[in-house]
Regions:
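Conserved catalytic cores of phosphodiester-cleaving nucleases, focusing on short active-site segments
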Residues: 109, 114-120
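Nucleic-acid endonuclease domains
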Residues: 1-105, 120-196
Length: 196
């Protein structure tokens, strides 16, 4: 079950919680899979980093793959908390209207009445070209992202708004926690967004 009710989100607090994740290496250990997803779905109900760490320990400390499960659950928690906060950032803007059905898998919000599924992603190493090429050829990157992401539960070909993060040192994932910075970028983008 995924909860998307972020009525009173304190972005500063969420940013602090997300940055606690930086203390551990960010590695998945495996491709996202439904079995480990179901075992770690509790991450959707816990906003506090220390609480999620404690729950992971309680659930998996005797499991032979404890470290892998820990990394997997922490990464899912981190990505979920960041995605919900970024969605909240979009919804704060006057040009955006939130969806009425929080369980809608194909859209997160509307911009000028056009539905979008928001996806925050790190710059994909599998794209095969550098970030400068992607900036000059955004349609090619968007096409690659459509084809190569969300192969599991959320695949669809509806409108998506990709927020792609890149950091020169390769630590792209850390940018998902920089919510105050992301808010400036999103507001700048939406302020210049024009109805088609």
């Amino acid at each position: 079950m995924i909860f998307r009710s972020f009525a009173a989100v304190n972005l500063e607090l969420v940013e602090i919680q997300l940055k606690k994740r930086w203390a551990s290496e960010y590695k998945w250990g495996r491709k996202q899979a439904d079995i480990w997803d179901s075992q770690t779905n509790f991450i959707y109900t816990i906003a506090d980093f220390d609480e999620v760490v404690a729950r992971i320990y309680t659930e998996f400390n005797t499991h032979r793959k404890y470290e892998d499960l820990r990394n997997y659950a922490l990464n899912r928690w981190y990505n979920f908390q960041s995605a919900m906060a970024v969605e909240h950032i979009f919804n704060l803007h006057s040009k955006v209207r939130r969806v009425k059905n929080d369980k809608d898998r194909e859209k997160d919000f509307y911009i000028y009445g056009v539905a979008f599924d928001h996806k925050t992603s790190v710059f994909p190493s599998g794209f095969g070209k550098d970030v400068d090429y992607a900036v000059d050829n955004p349609r090619e990157l968007a096409k690659w992202l459509y084809v190569n992401q969300s192969e599991q539960q959320r695949f669809h070909a509806k409108n998506r708004l990709f927020l792609v993060l890149h950091k020169k040192d390769g630590q792209h994932w850390k940018l998902k926690a920089e919510l105050s910075w992301i808010k400036v970028l999103v507001d700048t983008y939406l302020d210049s967004y024009r109805e088609l």
